[in-house]
Amino acid sequence: MKSGRFIGVMSGTSLDGVDVVLATIDEHRVAQLASLSWPIPVSLKQAVLDICQGQQLTLSQFGQLDTQLGRLFADAVNALLKEQNLQARDIVAIGCHGQTVWHEPTGVEPHTLQIGDNNQIVARTGITVVGDFRRRDIALGGQGAPLVPAFHHALLAHPTERRMVLNIGGIANLSLLIPGQPVGGYDTGPGNMLMDAWIWRQAGKPYDKDAEWARAGKVILPLLQNMLSDPYFSQPAPKSTGREYFNYGWLERHLRHFPGVDPRDVQATLAELTAVTISEQVLLSGGCERLMVCGGGSRNPLLMARLAALLPGTEVTTTDAVGISGDDMEALAFAWLAWRTLAGLPGNLPSVTGASQETVLGAIFPANP
Protein backbone atom coordinates (compact mmCIF):
# COMPACT_ATOMS: atom_id res chain seq x y z
CA MET A 1 0.00 0.00 0.00
CA LYS A 2 1.48 3.34 -1.09
CA SER A 3 2.21 5.71 1.79
CA GLY A 4 4.36 8.79 2.19
CA ARG A 5 4.11 12.40 1.11
CA PHE A 6 1.19 13.39 -1.11
CA ILE A 7 0.14 16.75 -2.53
CA GLY A 8 -3.48 17.81 -2.96
CA VAL A 9 -4.51 20.51 -5.44
CA MET A 10 -7.93 22.15 -5.36
CA SER A 11 -9.40 24.98 -7.40
CA GLY A 12 -12.99 25.30 -6.29
CA THR A 13 -16.10 27.04 -7.51
CA SER A 14 -15.15 30.21 -5.62
CA LEU A 15 -12.12 30.66 -7.92
CA ASP A 16 -10.34 32.49 -5.10
CA GLY A 17 -7.03 30.71 -5.72
CA VAL A 18 -5.41 27.32 -6.15
CA ASP A 19 -5.06 25.57 -2.79
CA VAL A 20 -2.06 23.24 -2.53
CA VAL A 21 -1.44 21.01 0.49
CA LEU A 22 1.44 18.71 1.43
CA ALA A 23 0.65 15.80 3.75
CA THR A 24 1.94 12.43 4.87
CA ILE A 25 -0.72 9.77 4.43
CA ASP A 26 -0.97 6.11 5.36
CA GLU A 27 -3.73 3.73 6.42
CA HIS A 28 -3.70 5.10 9.97
CA ARG A 29 -3.47 8.87 9.67
CA VAL A 30 -3.31 12.02 7.59
CA ALA A 31 -0.84 14.65 8.78
CA GLN A 32 -0.72 18.03 7.05
CA LEU A 33 2.81 19.38 6.66
CA ALA A 34 2.45 22.58 4.64
CA SER A 35 0.15 24.52 2.34
CA LEU A 36 -0.04 27.54 0.11
CA SER A 37 -2.60 29.45 -1.92
CA TRP A 38 -1.56 30.27 -5.49
CA PRO A 39 -3.26 33.16 -7.31
CA ILE A 40 -5.38 32.66 -10.41
CA PRO A 41 -4.74 35.38 -13.05
CA VAL A 42 -7.79 37.60 -13.55
CA SER A 43 -8.01 36.75 -17.27
CA LEU A 44 -7.99 33.02 -16.55
CA LYS A 45 -10.58 33.40 -13.80
CA GLN A 46 -12.85 35.33 -16.16
CA ALA A 47 -12.47 32.69 -18.87
CA VAL A 48 -13.59 30.00 -16.40
CA LEU A 49 -16.51 32.14 -15.21
CA ASP A 50 -17.62 32.69 -18.80
CA ILE A 51 -17.67 29.00 -19.70
CA CYS A 52 -19.44 28.12 -16.44
CA GLN A 53 -22.23 30.50 -17.39
CA GLY A 54 -22.72 28.99 -20.83
CA GLN A 55 -20.51 31.12 -23.06
CA GLN A 56 -19.61 29.15 -26.16
CA LEU A 57 -15.96 28.49 -26.97
CA THR A 58 -14.27 27.04 -30.01
CA LEU A 59 -12.52 23.72 -29.47
CA SER A 60 -9.23 25.59 -29.85
CA GLN A 61 -10.15 28.05 -27.09
CA PHE A 62 -11.31 25.21 -24.85
CA GLY A 63 -8.07 23.30 -25.41
CA GLN A 64 -6.02 26.39 -24.61
CA LEU A 65 -7.93 26.90 -21.35
CA ASP A 66 -7.36 23.26 -20.38
CA THR A 67 -3.63 23.65 -21.02
CA GLN A 68 -3.36 26.98 -19.19
CA LEU A 69 -5.04 25.57 -16.09
CA GLY A 70 -2.78 22.51 -16.12
CA ARG A 71 0.27 24.77 -16.23
CA LEU A 72 -1.16 26.91 -13.43
CA PHE A 73 -1.66 23.86 -11.20
CA ALA A 74 1.89 22.70 -11.96
CA ASP A 75 3.29 26.13 -11.08
CA ALA A 76 1.43 26.01 -7.76
CA VAL A 77 2.86 22.57 -6.94
CA ASN A 78 6.39 23.61 -7.89
CA ALA A 79 6.10 26.70 -5.69
CA LEU A 80 5.21 24.51 -2.70
CA LEU A 81 8.08 22.10 -3.46
CA LYS A 82 10.54 25.00 -3.64
CA GLU A 83 9.21 26.50 -0.42
CA GLN A 84 9.62 23.16 1.39
CA ASN A 85 12.98 22.34 -0.24
CA LEU A 86 11.60 19.10 -1.69
CA GLN A 87 12.23 17.27 -4.97
CA ALA A 88 9.82 15.34 -7.18
CA ARG A 89 11.25 12.07 -5.85
CA ASP A 90 10.08 13.03 -2.34
CA ILE A 91 6.40 12.94 -3.38
CA VAL A 92 4.37 9.78 -4.03
CA ALA A 93 1.66 11.50 -6.07
CA ILE A 94 -0.44 14.60 -6.61
CA GLY A 95 -4.22 14.42 -6.24
CA CYS A 96 -5.61 17.13 -8.52
CA HIS A 97 -9.33 17.86 -8.58
CA GLY A 98 -9.15 20.13 -11.62
CA GLN A 99 -11.42 23.09 -12.31
CA THR A 100 -15.10 22.25 -12.65
CA VAL A 101 -16.58 24.03 -15.65
CA TRP A 102 -19.83 22.09 -15.89
CA HIS A 103 -21.68 19.70 -13.60
CA GLU A 104 -24.91 18.10 -14.81
CA PRO A 105 -25.37 14.77 -13.00
CA THR A 106 -29.03 14.40 -13.94
CA GLY A 107 -30.78 14.46 -17.29
CA VAL A 108 -30.55 12.48 -20.50
CA GLU A 109 -26.75 12.08 -20.44
CA PRO A 110 -25.41 12.79 -16.93
CA HIS A 111 -21.93 14.29 -16.96
CA THR A 112 -19.40 16.43 -15.16
CA LEU A 113 -16.32 18.13 -16.52
CA GLN A 114 -13.17 19.21 -14.69
CA ILE A 115 -10.34 20.67 -16.75
CA GLY A 116 -6.66 21.43 -16.20
CA ASP A 117 -4.56 19.03 -18.24
CA ASN A 118 -3.01 16.49 -15.87
CA ASN A 119 -0.38 15.66 -18.50
CA GLN A 120 0.92 19.22 -18.15
CA ILE A 121 1.22 18.73 -14.40
CA VAL A 122 3.19 15.48 -14.78
CA ALA A 123 5.46 16.99 -17.42
CA ARG A 124 6.21 20.12 -15.39
CA THR A 125 6.59 18.52 -11.95
CA GLY A 126 7.87 15.02 -12.70
CA ILE A 127 5.33 13.61 -10.22
CA THR A 128 2.58 11.05 -10.80
CA VAL A 129 -0.87 12.67 -10.85
CA VAL A 130 -4.25 11.20 -9.95
CA GLY A 131 -7.12 13.21 -11.43
CA ASP A 132 -10.59 12.98 -12.99
CA PHE A 133 -12.12 11.83 -9.70
CA ARG A 134 -15.81 12.39 -10.35
CA ARG A 135 -16.77 10.69 -13.60
CA ARG A 136 -16.51 7.06 -12.45
CA ASP A 137 -19.16 7.72 -9.81
CA ILE A 138 -21.43 9.31 -12.44
CA ALA A 139 -20.87 6.31 -14.73
CA LEU A 140 -22.24 4.16 -11.90
CA GLY A 141 -25.39 6.27 -11.57
CA GLY A 142 -24.14 8.66 -8.89
CA GLN A 143 -23.98 12.43 -8.66
CA GLY A 144 -20.18 12.48 -8.77
CA ALA A 145 -20.43 14.76 -5.75
CA PRO A 146 -19.87 15.45 -3.01
CA LEU A 147 -16.78 13.28 -2.58
CA VAL A 148 -15.34 14.93 0.54
CA PRO A 149 -17.80 13.33 3.05
CA ALA A 150 -15.76 10.11 2.90
CA PHE A 151 -12.71 12.08 4.05
CA HIS A 152 -14.72 13.92 6.71
CA HIS A 153 -15.90 10.57 8.03
CA ALA A 154 -12.37 9.16 8.14
CA LEU A 155 -11.03 12.15 10.09
CA LEU A 156 -13.90 13.64 12.07
CA ALA A 157 -16.57 11.03 12.83
CA HIS A 158 -17.28 10.42 16.54
CA PRO A 159 -18.65 7.19 18.06
CA THR A 160 -21.42 8.90 20.05
CA GLU A 161 -21.68 12.58 19.07
CA ARG A 162 -23.95 13.62 16.19
CA ARG A 163 -21.66 15.66 13.96
CA MET A 164 -21.96 17.42 10.64
CA VAL A 165 -19.22 19.05 8.59
CA LEU A 166 -20.17 22.06 6.51
CA ASN A 167 -17.93 23.24 3.70
CA ILE A 168 -18.83 26.74 2.53
CA GLY A 169 -17.00 27.30 -0.72
CA GLY A 170 -18.68 28.67 -3.83
CA ILE A 171 -21.27 25.97 -3.21
CA ALA A 172 -22.09 24.82 0.33
CA ASN A 173 -22.07 21.11 1.07
CA LEU A 174 -22.92 19.15 4.17
CA SER A 175 -21.48 15.87 5.47
CA LEU A 176 -23.69 13.94 7.90
CA LEU A 177 -21.64 11.98 10.45
CA ILE A 178 -24.36 10.40 12.56
CA PRO A 179 -23.41 7.41 14.77
CA GLY A 180 -25.07 4.20 13.65
CA GLN A 181 -26.14 5.59 10.27
CA PRO A 182 -24.56 5.52 6.80
CA VAL A 183 -22.58 8.64 6.00
CA GLY A 184 -24.73 11.23 4.24
CA GLY A 185 -23.88 14.35 2.29
CA TYR A 186 -25.06 16.70 -0.44
CA ASP A 187 -24.84 20.26 -1.74
CA THR A 188 -27.24 22.55 0.11
CA GLY A 189 -27.02 25.30 -2.53
CA PRO A 190 -25.00 28.50 -2.93
CA GLY A 191 -22.27 29.19 -0.42
CA ASN A 192 -20.11 32.21 -1.23
CA MET A 193 -20.79 32.12 -4.96
CA LEU A 194 -23.66 34.58 -5.26
CA MET A 195 -22.30 36.91 -2.58
CA ASP A 196 -18.94 37.06 -4.37
CA ALA A 197 -20.54 37.55 -7.79
CA TRP A 198 -22.70 40.42 -6.53
CA ILE A 199 -19.99 42.43 -4.78
CA TRP A 200 -17.64 41.88 -7.74
CA ARG A 201 -20.21 43.37 -10.14
CA GLN A 202 -21.25 46.17 -7.81
CA ALA A 203 -18.01 47.21 -6.11
CA GLY A 204 -15.18 45.46 -7.95
CA LYS A 205 -14.21 43.47 -4.86
CA PRO A 206 -13.51 39.72 -5.04
CA TYR A 207 -15.46 39.07 -1.83
CA ASP A 208 -17.21 40.86 1.03
CA LYS A 209 -14.39 41.04 3.58
CA ASP A 210 -15.66 40.53 7.14
CA ALA A 211 -19.19 40.81 5.68
CA GLU A 212 -18.88 44.61 5.81
CA TRP A 213 -21.29 45.19 2.93
CA ALA A 214 -23.81 42.63 4.13
CA ARG A 215 -23.72 44.01 7.68
CA ALA A 216 -24.46 47.49 6.32
CA GLY A 217 -27.59 46.22 4.55
CA LYS A 218 -30.95 44.80 5.54
CA VAL A 219 -32.49 41.54 4.37
CA ILE A 220 -35.14 42.02 1.68
CA LEU A 221 -37.65 39.40 2.81
CA PRO A 222 -39.71 39.23 -0.43
CA LEU A 223 -36.49 38.73 -2.43
CA LEU A 224 -35.33 36.06 0.01
CA GLN A 225 -38.65 34.22 -0.26
CA ASN A 226 -38.52 34.48 -4.04
CA MET A 227 -35.08 32.87 -4.15
CA LEU A 228 -36.04 30.20 -1.61
CA SER A 229 -38.80 29.06 -3.98
CA ASP A 230 -36.17 27.60 -6.33
CA PRO A 231 -36.93 23.86 -6.71
CA TYR A 232 -33.36 22.84 -5.92
CA PHE A 233 -33.83 23.64 -2.25
CA SER A 234 -36.75 21.22 -1.84
CA GLN A 235 -35.17 18.47 -3.96
CA PRO A 236 -34.32 15.37 -1.89
CA ALA A 237 -30.80 13.99 -1.60
CA PRO A 238 -28.68 12.77 -3.29
CA LYS A 239 -28.19 16.08 -5.03
CA SER A 240 -25.35 18.31 -6.19
CA THR A 241 -25.09 21.60 -8.03
CA GLY A 242 -22.61 24.20 -9.23
CA ARG A 243 -21.91 27.50 -10.94
CA GLU A 244 -23.68 26.37 -14.11
CA TYR A 245 -26.92 26.67 -12.08
CA PHE A 246 -26.40 29.16 -9.24
CA ASN A 247 -24.68 31.98 -11.08
CA TYR A 248 -25.09 35.71 -11.71
CA GLY A 249 -27.75 35.03 -14.33
CA TRP A 250 -29.80 33.15 -11.71
CA LEU A 251 -29.54 36.14 -9.39
CA GLU A 252 -30.49 38.61 -12.13
CA ARG A 253 -33.66 36.67 -12.90
CA HIS A 254 -34.78 37.04 -9.29
CA LEU A 255 -33.76 40.70 -9.08
CA ARG A 256 -35.93 41.66 -12.07
CA HIS A 257 -38.88 41.74 -9.69
CA PHE A 258 -37.08 44.14 -7.32
CA PRO A 259 -35.79 47.17 -9.26
CA GLY A 260 -33.92 49.94 -7.49
CA VAL A 261 -32.89 47.98 -4.40
CA ASP A 262 -29.86 49.03 -2.36
CA PRO A 263 -26.88 46.83 -3.37
CA ARG A 264 -25.96 46.34 0.29
CA ASP A 265 -29.44 45.04 1.01
CA VAL A 266 -28.98 42.49 -1.77
CA GLN A 267 -25.67 41.47 -0.21
CA ALA A 268 -27.37 40.99 3.17
CA THR A 269 -30.13 38.96 1.53
CA LEU A 270 -27.66 36.68 -0.24
CA ALA A 271 -25.85 36.02 3.04
CA GLU A 272 -29.18 35.15 4.63
CA LEU A 273 -30.02 32.85 1.71
CA THR A 274 -26.86 30.85 2.34
CA ALA A 275 -27.46 30.69 6.10
CA VAL A 276 -31.14 29.75 5.81
CA THR A 277 -30.68 27.04 3.17
CA ILE A 278 -27.86 25.46 5.18
CA SER A 279 -29.69 25.56 8.52
CA GLU A 280 -32.88 24.16 7.00
CA GLN A 281 -30.97 21.18 5.63
CA VAL A 282 -29.21 20.59 8.96
CA LEU A 283 -32.60 20.46 10.69
CA LEU A 284 -34.24 18.34 7.97
CA SER A 285 -31.40 15.85 8.36
CA GLY A 286 -32.19 15.43 12.04
CA GLY A 287 -29.92 18.09 13.49
CA CYS A 288 -26.56 17.64 15.15
CA GLU A 289 -24.72 18.39 18.35
CA ARG A 290 -21.73 19.92 16.60
CA LEU A 291 -21.52 21.64 13.21
CA MET A 292 -17.90 22.02 12.08
CA VAL A 293 -17.47 24.61 9.33
CA CYS A 294 -14.64 24.84 6.80
CA GLY A 295 -14.02 26.70 3.55
CA GLY A 296 -13.93 30.42 2.90
CA GLY A 297 -17.37 30.94 4.43
CA SER A 298 -16.04 29.90 7.83
CA ARG A 299 -14.24 33.27 7.91
CA ASN A 300 -17.47 35.21 7.28
CA PRO A 301 -18.52 36.46 10.74
CA LEU A 302 -22.09 37.23 9.65
CA LEU A 303 -22.62 33.75 8.21
CA MET A 304 -21.21 32.09 11.31
CA ALA A 305 -23.37 34.23 13.59
CA ARG A 306 -26.52 33.55 11.58
CA LEU A 307 -25.87 29.81 11.55
CA ALA A 308 -25.49 29.84 15.34
CA ALA A 309 -28.73 31.82 15.70
CA LEU A 310 -30.67 29.57 13.32
CA LEU A 311 -29.39 26.39 14.98
CA PRO A 312 -29.93 26.85 18.73
CA GLY A 313 -28.65 23.88 20.68
CA THR A 314 -25.95 23.15 18.10
CA GLU A 315 -22.33 24.03 18.73
CA VAL A 316 -21.26 25.89 15.58
CA THR A 317 -17.48 25.90 15.31
CA THR A 318 -14.75 25.60 12.68
CA THR A 319 -12.67 22.58 11.75
CA ASP A 320 -9.65 24.64 12.83
CA ALA A 321 -10.89 24.15 16.39
CA VAL A 322 -10.30 20.40 16.01
CA GLY A 323 -6.91 20.80 14.35
CA ILE A 324 -7.78 20.73 10.63
CA SER A 325 -7.35 23.91 8.62
CA GLY A 326 -10.66 24.94 7.11
CA ASP A 327 -8.86 26.62 4.21
CA ASP A 328 -7.04 23.42 3.26
CA MET A 329 -9.73 20.79 3.88
CA GLU A 330 -10.69 20.10 0.26
CA ALA A 331 -7.14 20.02 -1.09
CA LEU A 332 -6.23 17.65 1.75
CA ALA A 333 -9.21 15.47 0.83
CA PHE A 334 -7.98 15.06 -2.75
CA ALA A 335 -4.49 14.15 -1.56
CA TRP A 336 -6.20 11.44 0.52
CA LEU A 337 -8.34 10.32 -2.42
CA ALA A 338 -5.17 10.01 -4.53
CA TRP A 339 -3.71 7.76 -1.82
CA ARG A 340 -6.85 5.61 -1.88
CA THR A 341 -6.74 5.32 -5.67
CA LEU A 342 -3.12 4.18 -5.68
CA ALA A 343 -3.94 1.74 -2.87
CA GLY A 344 -6.83 0.30 -4.92
CA LEU A 345 -9.40 1.45 -2.36
CA PRO A 346 -12.84 2.93 -3.14
CA GLY A 347 -13.19 6.69 -2.77
CA ASN A 348 -16.92 7.27 -3.16
CA LEU A 349 -19.78 6.60 -0.76
CA PRO A 350 -22.98 5.39 -2.49
CA SER A 351 -24.98 6.58 0.54
CA VAL A 352 -23.83 10.10 -0.39
CA THR A 353 -23.66 10.15 -4.19
CA GLY A 354 -26.33 7.59 -5.07
CA ALA A 355 -23.93 5.45 -7.12
CA SER A 356 -24.80 1.78 -7.54
CA GLN A 357 -21.60 0.65 -5.83
CA GLU A 358 -18.36 1.71 -4.22
CA THR A 359 -15.53 2.18 -6.70
CA VAL A 360 -11.92 3.24 -7.03
CA LEU A 361 -11.97 6.81 -8.34
CA GLY A 362 -9.85 8.72 -10.78
CA ALA A 363 -7.32 8.19 -13.52
CA ILE A 364 -3.59 7.79 -12.92
CA PHE A 365 -1.08 9.78 -14.99
CA PRO A 366 2.27 8.15 -14.14
CA ALA A 367 5.53 10.05 -14.11
CA ASN A 368 8.57 8.63 -15.86
CA PRO A 369 10.48 6.18 -13.65
UniProtKB/Swiss-Prot annotation:
GO terms for biological process: 1,6-anhydro-N-acetyl-beta-muramic acid catabolic process; amino sugar metabolic process; peptidoglycan turnover. It comes from Escherichia coli (strain 55989 / EAEC). Belongs to the anhydro-N-acetylmuramic acid kinase family. The gene is anmK. PANTHER family: ANHYDRO-N-ACETYLMURAMIC ACID KINASE (PTHR30605:SF0). Coiled coil: none annotated. Disulfide bonds: none annotated. Its EC number is 2.7.1.170. This is Anhydro-N-acetylmuramic acid kinase. Catalyzes the specific phosphorylation of 1,6-anhydro-N-acetylmuramic acid (anhMurNAc) with the simultaneous cleavage of the 1,6-anhydro ring, generating MurNAc-6-P. Is required for the utilization of anhMurNAc either imported from the medium or derived from its own cell wall murein, and thus plays a role in cell wall recycling. CDD domains: ASKHA_NBD_ANMK. Pathway: Amino-sugar metabolism; 1,6-anhydro-N-acetylmuramate degradation; Cell wall biogenesis; peptidoglycan recycling.
